[in-house]
A protein has these predicted regions:
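Catalytic active-site module of serine/aspartate enzymes centered on a nucleophile-bearing elbow/loop
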Residues: 313-355
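Bacterial N-terminal signal peptides
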Residues: 7-17
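N-terminal cap/lid segment of alpha/beta-hydrolase-fold proteins
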Residues: 21-50
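Short alpha-helix in the alpha/beta-hydrolase fold that links the catalytic acid
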Residues: 283, 297-307
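Short, surface-exposed "cap/lid" segments of acyl-processing enzymes
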Residues: 50-100, 105-108
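Alpha/beta-hydrolase active-site loop
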Residues: 114-136
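Short beta-strand/loop motif that positions the catalytic acidic residue
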Residues: 281, 287-289, 293
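Alpha/beta-hydrolase-fold enzymes
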Residues: 136-141, 146, 150-264
């Protein structure tokens, strides 16, 4: 039995009658699965059957940092997962640790957190487990993958470390350098240096109290950093803050802080330079950047594209390239026109590399 979300218990007190308009449960056709990593975590995956019938490889979607799988499946009008399913692809979302995850609890009856996980565990444990699970359940020898933000960076680490089982992949708003200027570049290394790597960064609680701000205050911090209101509505961002945000591990933030200071993302033991390893990647990868993305500026995303061995393609989402408005960070997966301007580009790439 799944435990009730603390969020669903406190939202009514915070938002009164408006809670019902924010929280949209998963639809009945969503199948919830769990896959156990070698180091003992149970990851949550959600499956949507292809409609009307499968016409291509299964697709696995992965969220960004301090997020969960609902980022790729927020509601009926903003769901990359349901969109791909409606276009003939059996589609899965995965929530990386600790989002929707349990450690050491068979059956998921009692969550127990395991401290100290970082980027390496996402690359070596979580993504291989999710890919293997989807391949096993579907019987597909290869699957396609799309990752937003951190979900794309983890994909880079997976492919650079020799990860197998992917036919084609897309990364959306995924920086491979964090030393090129950005709103948190100076702050995160200072904060991360003060905190214990076994702690968790509490993103979920503060996001609840930011919900009214996102709807009432123009040019608020989330608007300035995370999205362009010409693409993504305040209501959509309020929903994201209500049930799409999760705490994250400080060890992960410390590795990313090192990336901000040195320009290189390395494994904790220093043996792997993840960006340098991209030169040996042969899986086709589409790299998508948002023209107005302040979390993952265009040069930072372009660094990943340049490092890839290929085959590869680059796509910039902005007015100068035919979009109605310049895309911010979350717009790529939650924007009002993402289903007509962004996701078809990803699907077309997958289809061209499945022949």
């Amino acid at each position: 039995m799944r435990r009730p979300s603390l969020l669903l218990l406190v939202l009514p007190a915070l938002l009164g009658g408006g809670c019902a308009t924010l929280v949209e449960p998963l639809p009945r056709e969503a199948e919830v699965h769990r896959a156990r990593t070698p180091d003992g975590w149970e990851l949550e995956l959600v499956r949507y059957a292809a409609r009307p019938a499968a016409t291509g490889r299964p697709v696995l979607l992965c969220h960004g940092i301090t997020a969960n799988g609902r980022n790729m499946d927020l509601d009926s009008g903003h769901s990359m997962a349901r969109w791909f399913a409606a276009h003939g692809r059996q589609t899965w979302t995965v929530s990386l640790r600790p989002a929707g995850s349990f450690f050491g609890a068979e059956g998921g009856t009692s969550p127990r957190w395991k401290p100290g996980y970082g980027f390496d565990e996402l690359v070596d444990q979580d993504l291989p487990t999710a890919v293997a699970y989807v391949r096993r359940v579907t019987g597909a020898p290869l699957i396609d993958y799309a990752g937003h933000s951190l979900g794309g960076i983890v994909l880079y680490g997976y492919l650079g470390s020799g990860g197998q089982g992917l036919g084609a992949a897309a990364v959306l708003g995924s920086p491979m350098r964090l030393d090129l200027g950005g709103p948190v570049d100076a702050l995160l290394p200072q904060v991360a240096a003060l905190l214990n790597p076994g702690w968790y960064f509490p993103a979920k609680g503060p996001s609840l109290f930011g919900i009214p701000l996102a709807g009432m205050v123009q040019d608020n911090p989330t608007e300035l950093v995370l999205y362009n209101p010409e693409n993504t509505t305040h209501l959509t961002m309020q929903r994201l803050m209500a049930y799409g945000i999760e705490d994250t591990g400080m060890a992960l933030l410390q590795q990313l802080a090192g990336m901000m200071q040195t320009g290189e993302l390395k494994s904790r033991d220093g043996a792997r330079n993840y960006r340098q390893l991209l030169a040996g990647v042969t899986t086709p990868v589409l790299v998508v950047a948002g023209k107005r993305d302040r979390m993952a500026p265009v040069p930072a995303v372009k660094a990943g594209y340049r490092a890839l061995g290929g085959p590869k393609e680059w796509r910039l989402m902005g007015v100068e390239n035919g979009a109605r408005a310049d895309y911010g960070h979350m717009d790529l997966v939650l924007g009002e026109r993402a289903a007509t301007e962004v996701w078809p580009v990803v699907l077309d790439f997958f289809e061209r590399h499945s022949r």
